[in-house]
Swiss-Prot record:
Gene: AEL1
Stored InterPro entries: FSCA_dom_sf, MIP18, MIP18-like
Pfam families in UniProt: FeS_assembly_P (PF01883)
Gene3D superfamilies the UniProt entry points to: 6.10.250.1280, Fe-S cluster assembly (FSCA) (3.30.300.130)
Entry protein name: Protein AE7-like 1
Species this protein is from: Arabidopsis thaliana
Length: 154
């Protein structure tokens, strides 16, 4: 047993090799859910050496894009209900999308309904601009977020 891990034995899925685009219903300058999923699926979990895709924290179905309103919604599912890393995972998702997307998109990041004991609190924190900026200005949190986002590049 590994000491210090909240979920010492997560369920790990096989990594998908390639993503197949569905019928293109999005305008030329817009994004589609598969593109967004492709941006975030390789983010490493802050607690385990696996990606969010491998742990099924994010999936293709968890991304919604409304190009007419320029809104993106990502719901993620922590591996356990009392996951202490849910806020970090949300910060990683937000930081990665901020890096990859045009500024005009409104991004909402939420934990899947019923998947976390502090769902309301986590959702509120992840979608409060001031809290997100403050968290990402913290050098220790920023380093952890960067390690998760760029783990395959380090």
């Amino acid at each position: 047993m590994t000491l210090g891990l909240i979920n010492a034995n997560p369920v790990v899925q096989a990594k998908k090799e390639g993503l197949v685009r569905r019928e293109d219903q999005y305008r030329d300058d817009g994004v589609d859910p598969l593109e967004i999923y492709d941006y975030v699926r390789d983010i490493r979990d802050p607690e385990h050496p696996y990606t969010l895709e491998q742990l099924r924290v994010v999936s293709e179905e968890s991304v919604t894009v409304d190009d007419k309103l320029d809104r993106i919604l990502i719901t993620f599912t922590p591996t356990i209900q009392h996951c202490s890393m849910a806020n970090i995972i949300g910060l990683c998702l937000r930081a990665k999308l901020k890096e990859c997307l045009q500024l005009h998109y409104k991004v909402d990041i939420r934990v899947s309904p019923g998947s976390h004991a502090d769902e309301v609190s986590v959702n509120k924190q992840l979608n409060d601009k001031e809290r997100v900026v403050a968290a990402l200005e913290n050098p220790n949190l920023r380093q952890l977020v960067d390690e998760c986002i760029y783990s395959d590049e380090i």
